[in-house]
Amino acid sequence: MENRWQVMIVWQVDRMRIKTWKSLVKHHMYVSKKANRWFYRHHYESPHPKISSEVHIPLGEARLVIKTYWGLHTGEREWHLGQGVSIEWRKRRYSTQVDPGLADQLIHMYYFDCFSESAIRKAILGDIVSPRCEYQAGHNKVGSLQYLALTALIAPKQIKPPLPSVRKLTEDRWNKPQQTRGHRGSHTMNGH
């Protein structure tokens, strides 16, 4: 039988970021109990030697599986020391990979209190609204003016330690796009 390759997206991450992620997940699973339905699988429980941990997050009938890897081929930079993260959405026999932003939104939908757009309607109707959003990483857009006014009125409470964000885990701190100068600031265009 011929070899079959399966390609998957693995986000290159430095090991300190993975260590922080694991620590936050364990804290919110066992101490704060905000993620008590999550399941953490250690590296010695995994049959694959490159997997350093797995976090299974139930989302209704589906689940999100976040795997951290070690011992991968290093990247083009010296700090890419063979660490990585893959994010997978599974439901029964179907699975697909998702990006960190979508993963955070899915986590937000099923867990953590939110002062969301529906709070405006509830406040107008006289219902009690949740005063804050516990998981800011799950929002990827700017709210309406009414929403921004209500959030300015009710100051968000900072949670220590912060909730684990998949987007923050996979964020590239070193390769942020360079800010290019405008027409006035460009030395080559001005002939200097």
UniProtKB/Swiss-Prot annotation:
GO biological process, one term: viral life cycle
Chain intervals for the UniProt region annotation (Disordered): 165-192
Domain of life: Viruses
Post-translational modification summary for this protein: Processed in virion by the viral protease. Highly phosphorylated on serine and threonine residues.
InterPro entries: Vif (IPR000475)
Subcellular compartments: Host cytoplasm; Host cell membrane; Virion
Modified residues (Phosphoserine): S144, S165
Gene designation per UniProt: vif
Site (Cleavage in virion (by viral protease)): L150, T151
GO cellular component, one term: membrane
This protein's name: Virion infectivity factor
Region RNA-binding: start-end pairs: 75-114
Region (SOCS box-like): 151-180
Cited function: Counteracts the innate antiviral activity of host APOBEC3F and APOBEC3G by promoting their ubiquitination and degradation. Acts as a substrate recognition component of an E3 ubiquitin-protein ligase complex: mechanistically, Vif hijacks a host cullin-5-RING E3 ubiquitin-protein ligase complex (ECS complex) and the transcription coactivator CBFB/CBF-beta to form an active E3 ubiquitin-protein ligase complex that targets APOBEC3G and APOBEC3F for polyubiquitination, leading to their degradation by the proteasome.
Keyword presence, Metal-binding: yes
Short sequence motif HCCH motif: positions: 108-139
Induction: Expressed late during infection in a Rev-dependent manner.
UniProt family annotation: Belongs to the primate lentivirus group Vif protein family.
Parts forming coiled coils: none
Leftover remarks: Vif-defective viruses show catastrophic failure in reverse transcription due to APOBEC-induced mutations that initiate a DNA base repair pathway and compromise the structural integrity of the ssDNA. In the absence of Vif, the virion is morphologically abnormal.
Source organism of this protein record: Human immunodeficiency virus type 1 group M subtype D (isolate ELI)
Region named Interaction with host APOBEC3F and APOBEC3G: 54-72
Comment, domains: The BC-like-box motif mediates the interaction with elongin BC complex.
